[in-house]
């Protein structure tokens, strides 16, 4: 019998993942990571995670399953590796994905450390993706979920071979409707609970307001400029803008203007037309490859530049310094620094990295 830690968010997915694991006969405990509570900033919304209600829901489910339940306090690590990184990225003109950082540094790093300390064998999560071992390649592979509408392989591209060897994703072969049916059948209190949709520490979606509250600093106004460098007006501070943004600029113009670039060095926000947002190539750093050791030779595949962005035909390769280059068959709109680019070969995740630059 192996021993599993069920990483429980309080939602229906991780609860059913835990149930399916328990039914295999393995010894299980449930654990919720205490990261950041919305109540700490006086906010409560239904479609976020990390609330006190979520902890109670997870505890209730564990009670029904007859397994022990724990709360691991990782709030200090969350502040350092997720919230601080989020703020720093915005202040440097990037648009980060904190959910990927949470997986990278908390769920599949800090939780792994706790797993080893407790002498457990593997971690179970409610992510919609699949892990399979390829005998020929002698490697673990990360694959898309059967339910395309819920696939979360994009936010797991950073997983290493060591981590994949100690992860179970029981929902990868199920559809969301099936998961809810299982939860209802077993009387789980969260069977019809909303999926979390917002960043847990910015539940109202106002990133600039959060950053100012978090740092205690007001954002510094600067210039809006066109693509030639001509001043068009004043902006409220670069943390208020992201690539492709059109609303809230406050600049009168004969044609629609979009945020085409953000320069933290000059504190300028570059505005242009829609065509200025399209680029054919990007570079990425912090690269992690899963299905292979390297991409020294160009490989034809598909790439996603955002979580909800459709996959696009492309060619990818690495230079000697390890930087990932991705060239698209068709120019892509609003390739954004700080977001992840994830590469797919069919339903297999090849790997990915953090977007650094884009090239026309």
Over which residues does each language-model region extend?
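ATP-dependent adenylation/nucleotidyltransferase module used to activate substrates
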Residues: 1-157, 168, 178
């Amino acid at each position: 019998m192996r021993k599993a830690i069920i990483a429980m968010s309080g939602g229906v997915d991780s609860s059913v993942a835990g149930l399916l694991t328990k039914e295999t006969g393995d010894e299980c405990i449930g654990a919720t990571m205490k990261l950041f509570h919305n109540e700490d900033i006086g906010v409560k919304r239904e479609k976020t995670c990390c609330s006190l209600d979520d902890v109670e829901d997870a505890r209730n489910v564990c009670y029904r399953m007859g397994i022990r339940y724990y709360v691991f306090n990782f709030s200090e690590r969350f502040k350092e590796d997720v919230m601080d990184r989020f703020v720093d990225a915005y202040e440097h003109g990037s648009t980060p994905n904190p959910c990927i950082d949470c997986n990278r540094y908390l769920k599949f790093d800090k939780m792994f450390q706790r797993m080893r300390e407790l002498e457990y064998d593997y971690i179970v999560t409610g992510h919609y993706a699949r892990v399979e071992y390829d005998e020929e390649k002698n490697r673990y592979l990360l694959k898309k979920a059967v339910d395309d509408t819920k696939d979360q392989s994009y936010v797991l591209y950073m997983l290493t071979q060591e981590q994949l060897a100690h992860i179970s994703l029981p929902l990868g072969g199920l559809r969301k409707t099936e998961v809810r049916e299982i939860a209802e059948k077993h009387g789980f209190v969260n069977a019809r609970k909303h999926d979390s949709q917002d960043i847990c520490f910015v539940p109202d979606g106002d990133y600039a307001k959060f950053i100012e509250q978090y740092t205690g600093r007001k954002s510094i106004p600067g210039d809006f400029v066109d693509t030639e460098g001509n001043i068009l007006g004043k902006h409220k501070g670069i943390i208020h803008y992201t690539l492709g943004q059109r609303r809230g600029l406050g600049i009168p113009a004969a044609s629609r203007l979009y945020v085409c670039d953000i320069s933290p060095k000059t504190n300028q926000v570059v505005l242009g037309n829609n065509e200025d947002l399209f680029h054919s190539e990007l570079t990425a750093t912090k690269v992690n490859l899963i299905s292979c050791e390297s991409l020294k030779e160009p490989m034809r595949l598909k790439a996603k530049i955002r979580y909800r962005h459709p996959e696009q035909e492309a060619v990818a390769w690495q230079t000697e310094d390890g930087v990932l280059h991705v060239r698209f068959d068709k120019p892509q709109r609003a390739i954004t620094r700080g977001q992840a680019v994830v590469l797919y070969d069919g339903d297999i995740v090849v790997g990915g990295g953090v977007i650094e630059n884009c090239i026309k």
